[in-house]
UniProtKB/Swiss-Prot annotation:
Protein task: This antigen is associated with human resistance to schistosomiasis.
Self-association and partners: Homotetramer.
Protein name, UniProt field: Glyceraldehyde-3-phosphate dehydrogenase
One cellular component (GO) term of this entry: membrane
Record-listed E.C. numbers: 1.2.1.12
Catalytic reaction(s) noted: D-glyceraldehyde 3-phosphate + phosphate + NAD(+) = (2R)-3-phospho-glyceroyl phosphate + NADH + H(+)
Positions that bind NAD(+): 13-14, 35, 80, 123, 317
């Protein structure tokens, strides 16, 4: 079977890391990149050098006005309007929409206008696009779907863990907190915020309470949990890696040892590569560059009794998520060409 040909719109943190993930996983071919704010030479520099993930482990250069990455040529475009990006010229069927701007079906379909591309994968939650978390509900994808969402990095961490716990012990209700590294939407120093006032406070100086729809979104990918989970976030002064705290009430009583055993079995079985299990004395920096969606920290969780537990799971909110974008495209291509 041929491999999926991919275009990337928006060459920010996720766009660049999807490119890295594509070359690491080697299951799709990136053939085109569009960003109106970054020229070709600057793209080379930004691919090569990353303050968090280090130097790109390969060769990056230019050739005849194109990017050349590990010997493969990638076309570069600088269009502001998605409808004007010539994805078809490069053979890009699947477009990763990673600008953070075109996150609804209507806006994202501009990539498909005039038969430019065939499918769009939004690298963010969407108000109306079907949402998928690899390892949880990707098998509900149908080839008739033209625009889909890869959900959020936090939903990708929480949903696999919640699935294991709910399938085995039944989650009656739960609250999630994500202790989340700062992102580009925050301020380096205090400044005005277009949303909540405290979102505008200096990211590297503060622990900032914030909202997140990640827990509620689990109900979209696991319908049995719809209305049973909600959550909030604390933005903290670290550049990458975040951690989910899921506190939940169980319908079927279980000791913490039984819960650990269930997660460990899933991590080495049906969710291998998605959910990971560790009993090491870990801290956040240990997971920079992790390709897993969710790393269960067996030593960090606690239980009050057999029906009330706190579970802890880590995730590289940048690279782990980017790997799932590539995995989702790979799955879509397989279904589309079955």
């Amino acid at each position: 079977m041929s491999r999926a040909k991919v275009g990337i719109n928006g060459f920010g943190r996720i766009g660049r890391l999807v490119l890295r993930a594509a070359f690491l996983k080697n299951t799709v071919d990136v053939v085109s990149v569009n960003d109106p704010f970054i020229d070709l030479e600057y793209m080379v520099y930004m691919i090569k050098r990353d303050s968090t993930h280090g130097t790109f482990p390969g060769e990056v250069s230019t050739e005849n006005g194109k990017l050349k990455v590990n010997g493969k040529l990638i076309s570069v475009h600088c269009e502001r309007d998605p409808a004007n990006i010539p994805w078809d010229k490069d053979g890009a069927e699947y477009v990763v929409e990673s600008t953070g701007v075109f996150t609804t079906i209507d806006k994202a379909q501009a990539h498909i206008k005039n038969n430019r591309a065939k499918k769009v994968i939004i690298s963010a939650p969407s108000a109306d696009a079907p949402m998928f978390v690899v390892g949880v509900n990707e098998n509900s994808y149908e080839k008739s779907m033209s625009v889909v969402s890869n959900a959020s990095c936090t939903t990708n961490c929480l949903a696999p863990l919640a699935k294991v716990i709910h399938d085995k012990f039944e989650i009656v209700e739960g609250l999630m907190t994500t202790v989340h590294s700062f992102t580009a939407t925050q301020k380096v120093v205090d400044g005005p915020s277009s949303k909540l006032w405290r979102d505008g406070r200096g990211a590297m100086q503060n622990i900032i309470p914030a909202s997140t729809g990640a827990a509620k979104a689990v109900g979209k990918v696991i319908p049995a949990l719809n209305g049973k989970l909600t959550g909030m976030a604390f933005r903290v002064p670290t550049p990458d890696v975040s951690v989910v705290d899921l506190t939940c009430r169980l319908g079927k009583g279980a000791s913490y040892e039984e819960i650990k055993a269930a997660v460990k079995a899933a991590a080495s079985g049906p969710l291998k590569g998605i959910l990971e299990y560790t009993e090491d004395e870990v801290v956040s920096s240990d997971f920079v560059g992790s390709t897993s969606s969710s790393i269960f920290d067996a030593k960090a969780g606690i239980s009050l009794n057999n029906n009330f537990v706190k579970l802890v799971s880590w995730y590289d909110n940048e690279f782990g998520y980017s790997c799932r974008v590539v995995d989702l495209i790979t799955h879509m291509h397989k279904v589309d060409h079955a």
